[in-house]
């Protein structure tokens, strides 16, 4: 009898900020911490925030954040920007990493930004992809993502919202993400993260304008022009406020820049991080 196949989203377990944390840790060199998005259609782990090839040139760490994927869910069921940032710092501490580059996707971008503001000594460079981090009126797409209730039809509709190129959305992907969304405990914790009114979730993940304007880090801001989850204006604002920011907008692209323009995305991020490697070598 064959042993049950382990999900590729399961890596190894560490204790971070007191919580059992699933993460993938691969490659060697200067570390990059990847922080995934929040939507049920956004896979954590190696296929989530920033599926780029930097593991060939650097150490890449991709944890499931508190309450997501195969990481522990807090007993009190309470989530906040501050708690997730504490968990991310706990990951760095558990791995003995004093400083790293932070790559944040969507929800994860808001956490990456807040982490850099609260713990500037822990961050070298920032990459913010389709990121929250400033306040904006919640979009219908984000309302749908955060209000998701498990069904295959709902997952298919959600995937269609994420991707500009609908050919990327097939039955296999919808089934895979749907199955992940019906794992025991998933829906209870997800509903607790972003309860209505969900505008509060956007505002909780936003950082203060004064703090953003004081951010010293070189920052790459990336967005899809046709993004229906996080408005392009959020990244335009971040690029205006962050002193050392550069902005790249992908045309013909929704909320999945790292998937819809995978090759260009990989080169863009790797070149940005490699520039810092060269400066500090």
Curated annotation (Swiss-Prot):
SUPFAM superfamilies assigned to the protein according to its UniProt record, in alphabetical order: alpha/beta-Hydrolases (SSF53474)
Keywords in alphabetical order: Aromatic hydrocarbons catabolism, Hydrolase, Plasmid, Serine esterase
Pathway(s) the chain acts in: Aromatic compound metabolism; benzoate degradation via hydroxylation
GO cellular component terms given for this protein: membrane
Any one Pfam family match given in the protein's UniProt record, by short name: Abhydrolase_1
Signal sequence residues: none
Residue ranges constituting the AB hydrolase-1 domain according to the UniProt record: 31-261
Enzyme Commission identifier(s): 3.7.1.9
Active-site residues, as the UniProt record annotates them: 106, 227, 255
Gene Ontology MF term list: 2-hydroxymuconate-semialdehyde hydrolase activity; carboxylic ester hydrolase activity
Record keyword Calcium present: no
Region of interest: Disordered: 30-55
Catalytic activity: (2Z,4E)-2-hydroxy-6-oxohexa-2,4-dienoate + H2O = 2-oxopent-4-enoate + formate + H(+)
Described purpose of this protein according to its UniProt entry: Catalyzes the conversion of 2-hydroxymuconate semialdehyde to 2-hydroxypent-2,4-dienoate.
Name listed for the protein in its UniProt record: 2-hydroxymuconate semialdehyde hydrolase
Species annotation: Pseudomonas putida
Gene: xylF
């Amino acid at each position: 009898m064959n042993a049950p196949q382990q999900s590729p989203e399961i890596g190894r377990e560490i204790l971070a900020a007191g919580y059992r944390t699933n993460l993938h840790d691969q490659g060697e060199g200067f570390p990059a911490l990847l922080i995934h998005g929040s939507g049920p259609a956004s896979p954590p782990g190696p296929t989530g925030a920033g599926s780029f090839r930097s593991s060939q040139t650097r150490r890449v760490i991709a944890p499931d954040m508190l309450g997501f994927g195969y990481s522990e869910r807090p007993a009190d069921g309470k989530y906040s920007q501050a708690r997730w940032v504490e968990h991310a710092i706990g990951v760095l501490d558990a791995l003995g990493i004093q400083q790293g580059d932070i790559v944040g996707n969507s929800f994860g971008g808001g956490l990456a930004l807040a982490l850099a503001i609260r713990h500037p000594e822990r961050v070298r460079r920032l990459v913010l992809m389709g990121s929250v981090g400033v306040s904006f009126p919640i979009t219908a797409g984000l309302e749908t993502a955060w209000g998701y209730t498990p069904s295959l039809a709902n997952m298919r509709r959600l995937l269609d919202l994420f991707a500009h190129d609908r050919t990327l959305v097939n039955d296999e992907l919808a089934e895979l993400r749907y199955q992940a969304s019906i794992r025991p405990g998933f829906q209870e914790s997800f509903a607790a993260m972003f309860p209505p009114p969900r505008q509060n979730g956007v505002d909780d993940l936003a950082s203060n304008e004064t703090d953003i304007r004081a951010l010293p880090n070189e920052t790459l801001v990336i967005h899809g022009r046709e993004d229906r989850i996080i408005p392009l204006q959020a990244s335009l604002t971040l690029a205006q406020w962050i002193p050392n920011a550069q902005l790249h907008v992908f045309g013909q692209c929704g909320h999945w820049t790292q998937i819809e323009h995978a090759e260009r995305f990989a080169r863009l991020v790797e070149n940005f991080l490699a520039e810092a490697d060269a400066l500090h070598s």
